[in-house]
Swiss-Prot record:
<keyword id="KW-0597">Phosphoprotein</keyword>
<feature type="modified residue" description="Phosphoserine">
    <location>
        <position position="23"/>
    </location>
</feature>
<keyword id="KW-0560">Oxidoreductase</keyword>
<dbReference type="InterPro" id="IPR011032">
    <property type="entry name" value="GroES-like_sf"/>
</dbReference>
<dbReference type="GO" id="GO:0008270">
    <property type="term" value="F:zinc ion binding"/>
</dbReference>
<dbReference type="Pfam" id="PF00107">
    <property type="entry name" value="ADH_zinc_N"/>
</dbReference>
<feature type="binding site">
    <location>
        <position position="112"/>
    </location>
    <ligand>
        <name>Zn(2+) 2</name>
    </ligand>
</feature>
<dbReference type="InterPro" id="IPR013154">
    <property type="entry name" value="ADH-like_N"/>
</dbReference>
<dbReference type="GO" id="GO:0004745">
    <property type="term" value="F:all-trans-retinol dehydrogenase (NAD+) activity"/>
</dbReference>
<feature type="binding site">
    <location>
        <position position="47"/>
    </location>
    <ligand>
        <name>Zn(2+) 1</name>
    </ligand>
</feature>
<keyword id="KW-0007">Acetylation</keyword>
<keyword id="KW-0862">Zinc</keyword>
<dbReference type="InterPro" id="IPR020843">
    <property type="entry name" value="PKS_ER"/>
</dbReference>
<keyword id="KW-0479">Metal-binding</keyword>
<keyword id="KW-0443">Lipid metabolism</keyword>
<feature type="binding site">
    <location>
        <position position="101"/>
    </location>
    <ligand>
        <name>Zn(2+) 2</name>
    </ligand>
</feature>
<keyword id="KW-0520">NAD</keyword>
Length: 375
């Protein structure tokens, strides 16, 4: 029996308040409105950004259904939708590509004005919500809300992908892999023979290591306080791994000594102000580029000496690895299908969706790189 045009009742993980576990609830998911798509989720990755909301470091309206790194199958479409149809395999996009705004029309940048990242409303683009639980409307998260068996997204925030794609793997391209890999190849534009440093060896950081290797970096120095992640980093391309806790001097000084004055490219993939500064300071003062990849804590600021930039450093950042989402994500999936890279090393745990809290515990304890939840 077709569910198109009807309210769907299903299971979802609702975050009712910060610093509390997710609650598996029965929710109602309304049909898609015009230019919207309802998706049956198949697999979803657990990303540190979701945990930033749980901890309160990233403010987003609650109660909400979080989740943004996922893959699924189109269940139904709203009026006017032309780019996907029921049955298509898709990846929801936490940064849309409307194709009409100044950013989308420019060859540079990908931060479409339709995003719900800067000042999150917790709604779809028309300002309304599609989830109800216990008689209450539930907020969306960055326009995706993939911790649910069904979700509704705007058409400009969904990417159709190869019909043969293994969704339990390519879901990582929905955030972690694309963000890290793209930070190296698109944002920093790592050059052959260069020296790179990557701070943070979670799923995004390791993807940045993979991007540096793909771009031809000669040295890739991986930095983390969890030595258990070093073997995986070397497997994926790191040439050296260092633990800041092994040194008495600041890690940026260690890196400068190791690299004749500083690295060519550095990446902060943690989301801490102190490591953002260390990442900036470790790149060469005359020609280094430092990229902010990790999501910073809410309402916190960095203060720097402008001389650090006047000498020639470049300090930049980007979401989604600089990919224009609707164009870039399907191409990455195609590259994966062509075996240009593997995602297997990033997926350390696969759990049923109902064990979402266990998956977050693995993340917080440093025991996992990426946990994929299956529906």
């Amino acid at each position: 029996m077709s569910t198109a045009g009807k309210v769907i009742k299903c299971k979802a993980a609702v975050l009712w308040e910060v610093k509390k576990p997710f609650s598996i609830e029965d929710v109602e998911v309304a049909p898609p409105k015009a230019y919207e798509v309802r998706i049956k989720m198949v697999a979803v990755g657990i990303c540190r950004t979701d945990d930033h909301v749980v901890s309160g470091n990233l403010v987003s309206p609650l109660p909400a259904i979080l989740g943004h790194e996922a893959a699924g199958i189109v269940e139904s479409v709203g009026e006017g939708v032309t780019t996907v149809k029921p049955g298509d395999k898709v990846i929801p996009l936490f940064t849309p590509q409307c194709g009409k705004c100044r950013v989308c029309k420019s060859p540079e940048g990908n931060y479409c004005v339709k995003n719900d990242l800067s000042n999150p409303r917790g709604t779809l683009q028309d300002g309304t919500r599609r989830f109800t639980c216990r008689g209450k409307p539930i907020h969306h998260f960055v326009g995706t809300s993939t911790f649910s068996q069904y979700t509704v997204v705007d058409e400009n925030a969904v990417a159709k992908i190869d019909a043969a794609s293994p969704l339990e793997k390519v879901c990582l391209i929905g955030c972690g892999f694309s963000t890290g890999y793209g930070s190296a190849v698109n944002v920093a534009k790592v050059t052959p023979g260069s020296v790179c440093a990557v701070f943070g060896l979670g799923g995004v950081g390791l993807s940045a290591v993979m991007g540096c290797k793909a771009a031809g970096a000669a040295r890739i120095i991986a930095v983390d306080i969890n030595k258990d992640k070093f073997a995986k980093a070397k497997e994926l391309g790191a040439t050296e791994c260092i633990n800041p806790q092994d040194y008495k001097k600041p890690i940026q000084e260690v890196l400068k000594e190791m690299t004749d004055g500083g690295v060519d490219f550095s990446f902060e993939v943690i989301g801490r102000l102190d490591t953002m500064m260390a990442s900036l300071l470790c790149c060469h003062e005359a020609c280094g580029t430092s990229v902010i990849v990790g999501v910073p804590p809410d309402s916190q600021n960095l203060s720097i000496n402008p001389m650090l930039l006047l000498t020639g450093r470049t300090w930049k950042g980007a979401v989604y690895g600089g990919f224009k989402s609707r164009e870039g994500i399907p191409k990455l999936v195609a590259d994966f299908m062509a075996k240009k890279f593997s995602l297997d090393a990033l997926i350390t745990h696969v759990l049923p969706f109902e064990k979402i809290n266990e998956g977050f515990d693995l993340l917080r304890s440093g025991k996992s790189i990426r946990t994929v939840l299956t529906f």
